[in-house]
């Protein structure tokens, strides 16, 4: 009889425990958010142009600053004509920060004879790197300069040299 009494007391106890587990569950509805911002765009507004020059006997460099200043080293003689730094109009989210990644060396080629020159030492305003610029009001102008390595007259005969380069602008 004691066994039956003990079992009859334990059964409701186990039933109560299983009910407690069911009653311990809870659900809640939560929210999730996302905000789509304006795409970051870049438009070239001025092409990088080292202008007209003569390499003379041993060549050297033509340096174009992001601000548009032009100087030469070595025996390179600068002559009059159009020259300018590159510029890009960047648009995107209001007051967002962005990064600038400049190319390493780029080769430009003579359209008549396939002779080449190298463009190196790229510079930008604002300076390249992470968090380089801020789109105050949703836009900014970035200026680019570089150094053109010029060989001798044999290495770089007369003609127009051209090429392309890639600059990456990205949100931080």
Q: What are the residue ranges of the model-derived segments?
A:
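Bacterial N-terminal signal peptides
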Residues: 8-17
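Positively charged n-region of N-terminal signal peptides that target proteins for export
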Residues: 1-4
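Generic low-complexity segments that are intrinsically disordered, proline-rich and/or Lys/Arg-biased
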Residues: 13, 127-128
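Short beta-strand and strand-turn-strand segments in soluble, beta-rich domains
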Residues: 114-127
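Compositionally biased, intrinsically disordered/low-complexity regions enriched for serine, proline
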Residues: 9, 100, 123-124
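N-terminal small/polar-rich segments of proteins
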Residues: 23-101, 105-108, 132-172
